[in-house]
Amino acid sequence: MDEVLLLTGGISITTRALRALLATGATVAVFSPRGEPLGIFMRPVGDATGAKRRCQYKAAEDGRGLQYAKSWVFKKILGQRDNIKAWRRRLRGYSQYAESLAKALPGAGLHGAMETPRRRRRGQDGGQAGVRGRPTHPPVPPGAGRRSPGGAPRGQEASLRRDPQRGQSSGALHMYVIVVYDITENDVRAKVADILRAYGLARIQRSAYVGRLPPALVKELAERLARAVRGANADIAIFKVDKRTIDTSLRIPPRPPAGHVALH
């Protein structure tokens, strides 16, 4: 229930009491002895000013304030629509670029380029240690070593052990991944390049890397890149290529904030 305070003639109120009354949120109105409204005290809230309150009164009197508010909201919506259209055009360019790279994969001779950093990483700490952050097994070339009772070489058996955290074989590198980025800061670009190389991706263009990763590591890579470019003026698009084809039915997200990573 709203509390109404009526002050009749001959009643005075101190400034401290009036300030405390306004702080509670009560509306204090001043009337003439004839009952005519003279004004309303303004609450001491944030950026409230006399000019703003006067504009509110005028808007309430002639009804144009609602029209102005609707016009302002409509213009904001149109501005967001333009932002989404701009991002959609940019994303379409990323998609076309990645699709052209995917078509060039079979004859580009990229297998050796991707295998070199992967072998270097396996030689440093074995297995996927550079990705999971812990050593697993020493590098054993395929076919080397004694065979296990199941018939597979012990090196292959060790490399195909299931990762309990991901629930799949750590050696199942079967999906092509294309990473395209647009980064202005040199230090952030270098950080992103180091991360991509650590995951075994090979650089094929100035702002494009390609490699083969299991699906679980693709999501992990996207999260790590998002942390690396957080707060920077950077856009990164990750395209998962299955059987050297790209799904062109991409969802168009709203305009991303600074440091955006899109996973498709």
From Swiss-Prot:
Q: What superkingdom heads the lineage?
A: Archaea
Q: Which PANTHER family match?
A: CRISPR-ASSOCIATED ENDORIBONUCLEASE CAS2, CRISPR-ASSOCIATED ENDORIBONUCLEASE CAS2 3
What does this gene product do? CRISPR (clustered regularly interspaced short palindromic repeat), is an adaptive immune system that provides protection against mobile genetic elements (viruses, transposable elements and conjugative plasmids). CRISPR clusters contain sequences complementary to antecedent mobile elements and target invading nucleic acids. CRISPR clusters are transcribed and processed into CRISPR RNA (crRNA). Functions as a ssRNA-specific endoribonuclease. Involved in the integration of spacer DNA into the CRISPR cassette.
- Alphabetically ordered keywords of this record: Antiviral defense, Endonuclease, Hydrolase, Magnesium, Metal-binding, Nuclease
Q: Where is the composition biased (Low complexity)?
A: 143-155
What family does the database annotate?
A: In the N-terminal section; belongs to the CRISPR-associated endonuclease Cas1 family.
Q: Where is this region: CRISPR-associated endonuclease Cas2?
A: 176-264
- Species name: Thermoproteus tenax (strain ATCC 35583 / DSM 2078 / JCM 9277 / NBRC 100435 / Kra 1)
- What protein name is recorded for this chain? CRISPR-associated endonuclease Cas1/endonuclease Cas2 fusion
What is the gene name? cas2
Q: Which NCBIfam families match?
A: cas2
Which amino acids does the record list as binding Mg(2+)?
D182
InterPro entries reported for this sequence = CRISPR-assoc_Cas1, CRISPR_associated_Cas2, Virulence_VapD/CRISPR_Cas2
Q: Which GO terms describe its molecular function?
A: metal ion binding; nucleic acid binding; RNA endonuclease activity
What does the subunit section of this Swiss-Prot or TrEMBL entry state? Homodimer, forms a heterotetramer with a Cas1 homodimer. Can form a Cascis complex with Cas4 and Csa1.
Q: Which GO biological process entries does UniProt record here?
A: defense response to virus; maintenance of CRISPR repeat elements
Q: Which SUPFAM superfamilies match?
A: TTP0101/SSO1404-like
Known EC number(s)?
3.1.-.-
* Gene induction: Slightly induced by 20 J/m2 ultraviolet light. Member of the csa1-cas1/2-cas4 operon.
Show the segment(s) annotated as Disordered. Answer: 108-167
The segment annotated CRISPR-associated endonuclease Cas1 runs over: 1-104
Q: HAMAP family under this entry? A: Cas2
Question: What taxonomic classification does the UniProt entry list for its organism?
Answer: Archaea, Thermoproteota, Thermoprotei, Thermoproteales, Thermoproteaceae
